[in-house]
């Protein structure tokens, strides 16, 4: 993918997973793809599906044919309007579709303490969302000043996802002396 090289090889698949690339495999079934190119699917590591103004099922129709197989989605926009019901809608609409949608819990609802929104998700709400199995981690913690200051609510949200991925968001942090501490260094 990165070098632009094309390798002529066989691909061994077992239980729906690629288990080998090369030659000399013994197969119970073969598919001739001579002249075809097989490439990995694209994983979009950060997307807000709602920004496309369509639900996940419609979003999938646009991105899957173009090679995207998986998205890591932070549904904080719909959560700011509809709260936990919005997140549950996103999960239901994405289920069983052709696109793997990995939802993260929206950490910033409302988006900042300076704005209002249709919902508020506190640490308890996010802990319940984690327990529901609908999310795989904590999405985009945008309140990096709160992280650096050890704000109790922000830290409780992060703590609710101990052992899972917690996404950060720190524009302009750069060489800030606390930068290493923000990532646990």
Regions found by a protein language model. Give the residues of each.
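Short beta->alpha connector loops
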Residues: 54-55, 143-144, 171-174
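Functional cores that coordinate and move charged inorganic groups
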Residues: 152-185
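Short loop/turn motifs at secondary-structure junctions and domain boundaries
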Residues: 1-4, 52, 117-119
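Histidine-rich, glycine-flanked metal-binding segment
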Residues: 1-41
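Divalent-metal coordination cores built from histidine and acidic residues
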Residues: 57-165
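Divalent metal-coordination and catalytic microenvironments
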Residues: 11, 16, 35, 46, ...
């Amino acid at each position: 993918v990165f070098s632009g090289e094309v390798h002529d090889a066989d691909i061994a698949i077992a239980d729906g997973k690629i288990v080998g690339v090369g030659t000399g495999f013994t197969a119970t079934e073969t598919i001739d793809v001579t002249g075809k190119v097989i490439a990995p699917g694209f994983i979009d590591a950060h997307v807000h599906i709602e920004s496309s103004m369509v639900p996940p099922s419609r979003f999938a129709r646009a991105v899957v044919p173009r090679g995207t197989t998986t998205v890591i989605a932070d549904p904080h926009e719909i959560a700011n309007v509809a709260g936990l019901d919005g997140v549950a809608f996103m999960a239901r609409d994405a289920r069983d579709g052709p696109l793997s949608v990995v939802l993260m819990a929206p950490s910033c609802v409302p988006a900042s303490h300076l704005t209002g929104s249709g919902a508020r998700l506190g640490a308890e709400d996010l802990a319940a969302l984690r327990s529901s199995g609908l999310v795989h981690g904590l999405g985009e913690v945008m309140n990096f000043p709160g992280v650096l200051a050890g704000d109790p609510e922000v830290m409780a949200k992060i703590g609710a996802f101990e052992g899972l991925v917690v996404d950060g968001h720190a524009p302009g942090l750069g060489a800030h002396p606390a930068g290493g501490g923000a990532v646990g260094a």
